[in-house]
């Protein structure tokens, strides 16, 4: 088995766009990714998205870990931040895939781009490209499937998934970039005064986070 990536073969390629209102100068996709709560990630593609987290690779490169269903496969995406800019990120993962027939692997390249159209009117582009590994090619051959057949199935599944997540990602990035809404203080608190050192900060996702 080999995890060598076959960049000469394309397993799937999906490009989906969504327009959204967002303060363009405050958009920071890299920071949004690094601070994305797992439940917000789930809201961006229900029920496909399962969990998300942030870590670093051995060399210190930031990584985003995403667990999601693509078609019938449970995919563990281990994205390295290859490009991390406010309006553009390129994430590259050697991903583990659990299929009904067992485990295999693919490379996934995820590109996130926000462009300003006019004022706060923006366009978000979600691009996902997948290449097979040698392991993947051996896996499908062993199970009686040709590469064109596997690519057709993956293209359909990836396209459907991207169409689901793209507008929801755009809205989530826009909420993160929006200025915080001032909180109204209650006149009377039936539970008594707050404990010292405990306060709430507004979350861009509509939740009050204790700090």
Short names for language-model regions:
Residues 200-203:
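Serine residues within intrinsically disordered or low-complexity segments
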Residues 146-192:
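Long, compositionally biased interface segments
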């Amino acid at each position: 088995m080999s995890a060598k990536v076959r960049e000469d073969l394309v397993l799937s390629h999906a490009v989906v766009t969504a327009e959204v209102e967002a303060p363009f100068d405050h958009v920071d996709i890299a920071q949004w990714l690094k601070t994305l709560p797992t439940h917000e990630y789930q809201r961006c593609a229900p029920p496909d998205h399962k969990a998300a987290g942030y870590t670093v690779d051995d060399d210190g490169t930031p990584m985003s870990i995403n667990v999601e269903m693509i078609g019938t496969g449970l995919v563990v995406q281990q994205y390295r931040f290859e490009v991390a800019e406010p309006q553009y990120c390129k994430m590259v993962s050697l991903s583990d895939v659990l299929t009904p027939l067992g485990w295999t692997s693919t490379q996934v390249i995820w590109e996130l781009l926000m462009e300003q159209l006019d004022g706060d009117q923006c366009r978000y582009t979600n691009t996902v490209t997948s290449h097979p590994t040698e392991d993947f090619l051996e896996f499908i051959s062993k199970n009686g499937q040709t590469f064109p057949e596997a690519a057709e199935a993956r293209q359909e599944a990836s396209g459907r998934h991207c169409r689901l997540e793209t507008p929801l990602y755009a809205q989530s990035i826009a909420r993160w970039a929006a200025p915080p809404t001032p909180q109204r203080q209650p006149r009377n608190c039936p539970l008594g005064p707050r404990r010292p050192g405990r306060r709430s900060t507004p979350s861009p996702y509509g939740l009050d986070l204790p700090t």
